[in-house]
UniProtKB/Swiss-Prot annotation:
Assigned keywords, A-Z: Acyltransferase, Isoprene biosynthesis, Transferase
Native source organism of the sequence: Methanococcus vannielii (strain ATCC 35089 / DSM 1224 / JCM 13029 / OCM 148 / SB)
Name by which UniProt lists this protein: Hydroxymethylglutaryl-CoA synthase
CDD domains per the UniProt record, alphabetical: init_cond_enzymes (cd00827)
Organism phylogeny: Archaea, Methanobacteriati, Methanobacteriota, Methanomada group, Methanococci
Binding site for (3S)-3-hydroxy-3-methylglutaryl-CoA: D30, A31, C114, T155, T205, H238, N270, S300
GO biological process, any: farnesyl diphosphate biosynthetic process, mevalonate pathway
EC number: 2.3.3.10
NCBIfam families: HMG_CoA_syn_Arc (TIGR00748), PRK04262.1 (NF003274)
Function: Catalyzes the condensation of acetyl-CoA with acetoacetyl-CoA to form 3-hydroxy-3-methylglutaryl-CoA (HMG-CoA). Functions in the mevalonate (MVA) pathway leading to isopentenyl diphosphate (IPP), a key precursor for the biosynthesis of isoprenoid compounds that are building blocks of archaeal membrane lipids.
Length: 349
């Protein structure tokens, strides 16, 4: 495979946050027990003028700022999400036009629960490595919803990150050493057409779903690359909550110094398709030349994509060309449960 890698990346988060205590108070629940059980303290909430398209556009523009490339040279735009604003009207077309790509671009909206963004990255890798195009963009983004009173309401959040994939060695911020996927038919989480909120299998979402796929993909990736956890400086996993993330990292043998920058859920919630792309963006913001990163996404239904990535010396040139993920995390305004219901359109007549 021709060498391909990341030439630009960018992230975006809404500024609004709601604390677990605020949600628990509305439902008469024990906030401390919930925070301890989920390892989530607060989550992001999109404003009334924000959706997956607006977040994707902001992230894509920041990725372009870091890349320094002409957007008209981008040959593909893929947006992975399970909360596209329209049932019939592609988010990818909105993003492509907003960042001024040429109309001569292939674009598509992707869905695979929370791993649609990493699936898009794999597609971009294939297109660039084949020589079909010089650059391709993948975005992972969501404005996730949970039914009022459901456990998901404490975690379902909003945010996303964009990645521009290229094959010119001198432009790479980080190169892909390899990728590996693991997929089965596992019904742990679903939502049918016309239903407002998803359903989930409760505890079934753990061992036979999340852990089976994440651990299998992780072990398969390391076997393919002939590596161990000691070969990596950082790691990031899908994070439906902080508890699952920490358990997966520790089961595989990663330590806190390796997994800390990728773990955003305690301060952000689960951004679904944006979770791993955002975690990776925060790692890149803190990386230096030669750092090796281990990445595993997860999407219910179910599947995982794994990546082995090495950071290049260009990283120091681009980090400050756009706002960092950590800066976005610090820009926050807390809202109460009533405002949250209003912003998320949960009051239905």
């Amino acid at each position: 495979m021709k060498e391909v890698g990341i030439v630009g990346y960018g992230s975006d988060l809404p500024k609004y946050r709601i604390k677990a205590e605020e949600i628990a108070k509305a439902w008469g629940k024990d906030a401390e027990a919930i925070k301890k059980g989920l390892v989530v303290n607060e989550k992001s909430v999109p404003g009334p003028d924000e959706d997956s398209a607006t977040i994707a556009v902001q992230a894509a523009r920041r990725a372009l700022s870091r890349s320094g490339i002409n957007p008209k040279n981008i040959g593909a735009v893929y947006v992975g999400s399970e909360s596209h604003p329209y049932a019939v009207k592609p988010t990818s077309g909105i993003v492509a036009e907003a960042v001024c790509t040429s109309p001569e671009v292939t674009a598509a909206d992707l869905e695979f629960a929370c791993k649609a963004g990493t699936a898009g990255i794999q597609m971009c890798m294939g297109l660039v490595s084949s020589g079909m195009m010089d650059y391709a963009m993948a975005v992972g983004v969501d404005t996730a919803q949970g039914a009022p009173g459901d456990a998901l309401e404490y975690t379902a959040a909003a945010g996303g990150a964009a990645y521009i994939i290229g094959g010119k060695k001198e432009e790479l911020i980080a190169k892909f050493n390899g990728t590996y996927s693991y997929t089965t038919d596992t019904p742990d989480f679903w939502r049918r057409e016309h239903e407002h909120y998803p359903k989930h299998g409760g505890r079934f979402t753990g061992e036979p779903a999340y852990f089976r796929h994440v651990l299998s993909a992780a072990k398969g990736m390391m076997e393919k690359m002939d590596t161990t956890t000691k070969d990596y400086d950082y790691c990031v996993f899908h994070q439906p909550n902080g508890k699952f993330y920490l358990s997966a990292a520790k089961q595989l043998g990663f330590n806190e110094n390796q997994y800390r920058y990728g773990l955003l859920t305690p301060y952000l919630g689960n951004t679904y398709s944006g979770a791993v792309p955002l975690g990776l963006s925060n790692i890149l913001d803190h990386s230096k030349t030669g750092d090796r990163i281990f990445v595993v996404s997860y999407g219910s239904g179910a599947g995982s994509d794994a990546f082995d990535i090495t950071v290049t010396d260009r990283i120091s040139e681009v980090i400050n060309k756009a706002v960092t993920t950590e800066e976005l995390l610090s820009r926050k305004k807390y809202i109460d449960y009533a405002v949250y219901l209003k912003y998320r359109g949960k009051i239905r007549m």
